[in-house]
């Protein structure tokens, strides 16, 4: 079962008071319901591929409208994924329910946004967002490369109302038009965990945070290892270059023609190719030399090698340095 499916399953098991049940059911029916007209009656079908959500819708309707007759149907998809489709059907008397949930008004007109009366209390705002997430929400698994939570709605007015409802909780949600509708989405991991807390998905929140923390730790360790590897490669590369230059000088003019201080560090570098500059400095016979001092001497050796290669080496200048 996916992370999103687990989160939704958790939400369907929450207990509700009547006002919150009404707000949640309003979102579920508005987003997953379809109307039918016949024999002067209004019928309602609410469909979902999630059995737990279908049971939730059935339970909410029974809780709020015990006198309305409900059917729970199961159909098999014959194309593509072949999942079961669960349908909660009200063949008659749906108009009363739709008006009470502020989906239709008294003139039998569809209300495209969210009625303030449905989300009057803070708990009802949370419940409506819970219903909207159950009906049209999706969330990436926290292990994936990017964090993303979204709620899909067919109507721009309703999508904007969902965004405003979310931003009432300081979530910094944004909207985007898609090919077949609109979405309200979150990209920041902290905002996603806040949203999960708001709608009551606390187990999903804890799992999300655990995975996110481990993921951040792995990324930090990888960055540290990469940095240390890069530094090590740089150090090894410099040591190999220094040894190559020292051997080139020894082959062309001989190390004995270098100033004594450079001779000593050159011989130590060839003998101890894998040690650090600090360790080289501690090996000097004339007394400990600082890391910067060793680095300066090795740079001078590199300069001598470069001049020998390009023909600009001046033996007279070398003789003036030999006693140094």
UniProtKB/Swiss-Prot annotation:
One Gene Ontology term from the biological process aspect of the record: regulation of sporulation
Keywords: Cell cycle, Cell division, DNA-binding
Species per Swiss-Prot/TrEMBL record: Shouchella clausii (strain KSM-K16)
InterPro entries in UniProt: Homing_endonucl, Sporu_reg_WhiA_N_dom, Sporulation_regulator_WhiA, Sporulation_regulator_WhiA_C, WhiA_LAGLIDADG_dom
SUPFAM superfamilies noted in UniProt: Homing endonucleases
Protein name according to UniProt: Probable cell division protein WhiA
Family listed: Belongs to the WhiA family.
Phylogenetic classification of the source organism: Bacteria, Bacillati, Bacillota, Bacilli, Bacillales
Function: Involved in cell division and chromosome segregation.
């Amino acid at each position: 079962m996916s992370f999103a499916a687990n989160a939704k399953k958790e939400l369907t098991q929450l207990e509700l008071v009547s006002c919150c049940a009404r707000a949640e059911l309003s979102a579920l029916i508005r987003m997953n319901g379809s109307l039918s007209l016949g024999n002067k009656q209004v019928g309602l079908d609410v469909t979902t591929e999630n059995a737990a959500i279908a049971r939730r819708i059935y339970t909410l309707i029974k809780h709020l409208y015990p006198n309305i007759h409900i059917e729970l149907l199961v159909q098999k998809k014959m194309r593509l994924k072949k999942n079961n489709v669960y349908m909660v059907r009200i063949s008659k008397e749906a108009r009363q329910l739709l008006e009470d949930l502020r989906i239709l008004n008294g003139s039998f007109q569809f209300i495209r946004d969210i009625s303030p009366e449905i989300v009057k209390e803070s708990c009802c705002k949370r419940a409506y967002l819970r219903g909207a997430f159950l009906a049209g929400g999706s969330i990436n698994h926290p292990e994936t490369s990017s964090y993303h939570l979204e709620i899909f709605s067919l109507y721009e007015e309703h999508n904007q109302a969902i965004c405003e409802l979310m931003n009432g909780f300081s979530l910094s949600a944004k909207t985007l038009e898609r090919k077949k509708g609109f979405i309200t989405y979150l990209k920041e991991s902290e905002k996603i965990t806040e949203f999960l807390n708001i709608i009551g998905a606390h187990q999903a929140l804890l799992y999300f945070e655990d995975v996110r923390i481990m993921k951040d730790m792995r990324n930090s360790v990888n960055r540290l290892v990469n940095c240390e590897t890069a530094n090590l490669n740089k150090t090894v590369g410099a040591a190999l270059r220094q040894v190559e230059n020292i051997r080139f000088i020894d082959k062309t003019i001989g190390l004995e023609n270098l100033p004594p201080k450079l001779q000593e560090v050159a011989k130590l570098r060839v003998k101890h190719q894998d040690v650090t500059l600090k360790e080289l400095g501690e090996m000097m016979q004339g007394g400990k030399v600082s890391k910067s001092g060793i680095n300066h001497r090795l740079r001078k050796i590199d300069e001598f090698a470069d001049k020998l290669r390009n023909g600009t080496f001046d033996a007279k200048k070398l003789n003036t340095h030999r006693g140094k």
